[in-house]
């Protein structure tokens, strides 16, 4: 048993001298493994007299349990030290100032479109869309625009060939809607349109939204009330509105809509060129020829239509003086609208 005590002391000393978990594992195998020192001592029980075996076996088991206990305690100590070191390395100081996330936002044109659509869908209009590459018939002919009209000129329209072009307005969507369904029709048609023009107030590509209502007993008073209410809601203020007689091939009578300048409240400024008025859209009663070519009887149904540039309304609402700013992708400008 003296050899057993010495063996246990040797094992405990080795455990205390171990520098890491790998060394502990080697010590465990050396003393407690299948061929370990204490395991070999246990195998010598067969050489002892039968009456001594229980006592000696119990002593060997106590020795093994003591070594195992010290091994496990030392291993737990190493694991705790390793965990503490890892936590210290990964420690987050919650008192440090945070790094803010830069959030995106809707483009001002998108915001303006959504605002317009929200008003008209609220009063019962649907949203209709159509192709940006149009044929001559739907872009011009079906809208009562004659062949000699200046809008058909290469200077104003982007042509692919003699019959196909980039649409110059969203009116073709109205035509396609009237061709595919019978009145009552209440739609707004938002989308990109293209014209050969580019300066501080014009872009070769811009956004337009047009509206169409076709039903029985529709008159100019209905159109006037709709537009006045839209402008009041869109700009969130009571504005003077006037309708000036004008000419559009697809409406008769036709009018240009002016509103009180939102910058100077009608007193006259640089934006309104000292007139106190701003032109915001065109409108009119749908021409009987347009209804007729779309398969609608103008004797039974009447309608009104209007169209406005989305960029124009966005410029007025947000006080932007250069149309091109909307398309420059300058985050310093766009971040103001988040």
From Swiss-Prot:
Is Secreted a UniProt keyword of this protein?
A: no
Top-level class of the enzyme under EC nomenclature:
ligase
This protein is called Phenylalanine--tRNA ligase alpha subunit
Q: From what organism does this protein derive?
A: Pseudomonas savastanoi pv. phaseolicola (strain 1448A / Race 6) (Pseudomonas syringae pv. phaseolicola (strain 1448A / Race 6))
Q: In the record's cofactor note, how is the cofactor described as bound?
A: Binds 2 magnesium ions per tetramer.
Spell out the molecular function terms from Gene Ontology: ATP binding; magnesium ion binding; phenylalanine-tRNA ligase activity; tRNA binding
**CDD domains for this protein:** PheRS_alpha_core (cd00496)
Cofactor or coenzyme needed: Mg(2+)
Describe the subunit structure.
Tetramer of two alpha and two beta subunits.
Sorted alphabetically, the Gene Ontology cellular component annotations on this record are: cytoplasm
Q: Which family does it belong to?
A: Belongs to the class-II aminoacyl-tRNA synthetase family. Phe-tRNA synthetase alpha subunit type 1 subfamily.
Pfam families referenced in this protein's UniProt entry, alphabetically: Phe_tRNA-synt_N, tRNA-synt_2d
């Amino acid at each position: 048993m003296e050899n057993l005590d010495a063996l246990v002391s040797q094992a405990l000393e080795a455990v205390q001298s171990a520098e890491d978990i790998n060394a502990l594992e080697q010590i465990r195998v050396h003393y407690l493994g299948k061929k370990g020192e204490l395991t070999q001592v246990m195998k010598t029980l067969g050489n002892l007299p039968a009456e001594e075996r229980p006592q000696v076996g119990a002593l060997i088991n106590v020795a093994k349990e003591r070594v195992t206990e010290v091994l496990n305690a030392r291993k737990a100590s190493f694991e705790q030290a390793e965990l503490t070191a890892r936590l210290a390395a990964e420690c987050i100081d919650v008192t440090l100032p945070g790094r803010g996330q830069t959030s995106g936002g809707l483009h001002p044109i998108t915001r303006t479109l959504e605002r317009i659509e929200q008003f008209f869908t609220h009063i019962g209009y649907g949203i209709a869309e159509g192709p940006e590459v149009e044929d001559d018939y739907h872009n011009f002919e079906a809208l009562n625009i004659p062949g000699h009209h200046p809008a058909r000129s290469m200077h104003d329209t982007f042509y692919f060939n003699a019959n196909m072009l980039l649409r110059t307005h969203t009116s073709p969507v109205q035509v396609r809607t009237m061709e595919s369904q019978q009145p009552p029709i209440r739609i707004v048609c938002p989308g990109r349109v293209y014209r050969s023009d580019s300066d501080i107030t014009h872009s070769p590509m811009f956004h337009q939204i047009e509206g169409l209502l076709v039903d029985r007993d529709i008159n100019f008073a209905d159109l006037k009330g709709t537009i006045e209410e839209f402008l009041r809601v869109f700009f969130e203020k009571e504005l003077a509105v006037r309708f000036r007689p004008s000419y559009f091939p697809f409406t008769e009578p036709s009018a240009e809509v002016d509103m009180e300048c939102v910058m100077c409240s009608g007193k006259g400024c640089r934006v309104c060129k000292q007139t106190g008025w701003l032109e915001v859209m065109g409108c009119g009663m749908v021409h009987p020829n347009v209804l007729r070519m779309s398969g609608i009887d103008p004797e039974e149904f009447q309608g009104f239509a209007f169209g406005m540039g989305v960029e124009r309304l966005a410029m007025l609402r947000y006080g932007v003086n250069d149309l091109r700013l909307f398309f420059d992708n300058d985050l310093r400008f766009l971040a103001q609208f988040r």
